[in-house]
Design a protein with these regions (language model features):
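Generic detector of isolated residues embedded in canonical secondary-structure elements
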Residues: 1, 77-78, 194
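Short, low-complexity, Pro/Ser/Thr/Gly-rich segments in the mature regions of secreted, periplasmic
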Residues: 192-206
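Sec-exported extracytoplasmic/periplasmic mature domains
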Residues: 80, 127-130, 196, 200
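Bacterial signal peptide processing site
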Residues: 3-5
Length: 206
């Protein structure tokens, strides 16, 4: 499982608060929606997989489009997508036997800018991972992002990348986290290469 019992309890609480459920149904025809998607992305032939959960496909590329925070995440088409969080900030994806779990989520950073520098905020995020039992063996911090790798409390490998980006005129921090068993290291490295090459995109939408 990709979530701890604590996370599940939090999710159950959020689930009971329907005020937070900001997912709209598709009120125009699918064809009209896809015409708009094509125009936004500058391509032709995007297919809709799951509107509520933001899943689309272009050729053989499956991607998650988070409309609330304006970012895209390319992920392996063989993975099963989950439900977009009720806060609308992310989603999760798993391979067939759940030996690889992929999570992506966004948070607003600009609301904290008066109190913390980005570096201080990154340090707090990393400290939070350590407090949750993650053992970090590799850490790389730049002016606008950090990458950490290591092992989870349960003995899985993990990779996490957080990047500060601007979208809808807001500063957000976008986090991608991958947890995988040692036997799936090769497959996981291929996915990690995608995100190291920035196949996670925050795009200004109008």
């Amino acid at each position: 499982s990709c979530t701890s019992k604590k996370d599940s309890n939090i999710q159950a609480t959020i689930d009971s608060l329907s005020i937070y459920d900001n997912h709209s149904t598709l009120e125009i025809s699918e064809a009209k929606h896809l015409q708009w998607v094509d125009s936004v992305l500058g391509v032709k032939g995007v297919k809709l997989i799951d509107y509520r959960n933001g899943i689309y496909q272009y050729d053989d590329t499956r991607f998650y489009w988070n409309r609330t925070f304006g970012y895209f995440l390319v992920y392996p088409s063989s993975f099963t997508h989950g439900k977009e969080s009720d806060l609308g900030n992310g989603n999760h994806f798993v391979n067939e036997d759940s030996t690889i779990c992929l999570n992506v989520y966004a948070t607003y950073f600009d609301v904290f800018k008066d109190d913390y520098s980005l570096r201080e905020w990154f340090d707090m995020m990393i400290d939070s991972e350590i407090e949750q039992g993650y053992r970090i063996t590799k850490k790389d911090i730049t002016d606008h992002s950090y990458t950490i790798e290591g092992n989870t409390k349960g003995g899985r490998c993990f990779y996490s990348k957080a990047t500060c980006k601007k979208t809808y005129e807001r500063d957000i921090i976008l986090t991608v986290k991958l947890e995988y068993t040692d036997s799936k290291k090769e497959e996981a490295r291929a996915i990690i290469c995608l995100y190291n090459n920035d196949k996670i995109i925050a795009k200004e939408l109008h």
